[in-house]
Amino acid sequence: MAREYSESAGSATDCETEGEFRNHSLVLPPAAAGLRLDQALARELPQYSRARLQGWIEAGAVKVDGRQMRGKDKVLGGEQVQIAARLEADDRVVAEAQPLAVVHQDRALFVINKPPGMVVHPGAGNPSHTLQNALLALDPKLALVPRAGLVHRLDKDTSGLLVVARTLEAHARLVAALGEREIERNYIAICTGVMTGGGTVDAPIGRHRAQRTRMAVRNDGREAVTHYRVAERYRAHTLVRVQLETGRTHQIRVHLAHIGYPIIGDPVYAGRRRLPAGCSPALTAALGAFPRQALHAARLALAHPTTGRSLEWEAPPPEDMARLIAVLEADQQQHERT
């Protein structure tokens, strides 16, 4: 059954305003029977986080057939739900102005080229100076959107493109598109070892059994699919182009290490450095000094969340990775001349 509800707030292209009321009227579908109230509402109103909906329920802003229910109460389907709630900013993460490379912006989204070394979300050991802090300084209204509008993430030392939703509606649509694998995310990586050709790694990923900060290929892990192809071969390394089909934690790093081609500089999965015979001093120095995993989110393609128009962006590798590629190419050319 199609969802039936009405909303008095602005369109998806309107920016949310703190303190603005959101009035919803909807009928829960028969398929909601047996679900908790908060679960049923999360399905019907995906533009809001479940935590926000639970807060509204606890505050008495949600009425079901004219009466108040608890979030854990089960629904039957067919109930009339009325919501009169005020949007409140999430003030747990503070705004901190930092330089950001904004590749694209419109009323619905930003596309950011994240530098290496920047953490995406605050957490243990990184309470501030993250991308989320910087986004809140760039646009304070992002405090009304879950995780300041961040739809996906990159590891701290991975550089490249990220999409950020500026409205609740855009966030819901982009999260749904990511779940349906409708957002294309392409990376470049420099791996140890010379690949003979491209391929696909289809291997589930889960938390490492002994080292909880690591991920590993595990039979009981979550589905993880990575496509890769050779872009350039060097004497002992390969430049590869990678496309994610799923988006598990450390997925590219784990999958490439799993097939025997770990990413240069990866402090967790790369193991010992391997140098080609007769390695030039320049290459030895470049490999020894490279400070991070050589992984960059180079291309992002998606349908705009409000217009549906197909959009794509590309970002060249940052300076440190570009220098390493240049040294690898020079080493290869020198070897071919001798």
Where are each of the predicted segments found?
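RNA pseudouridine synthases
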Residues: 1-338
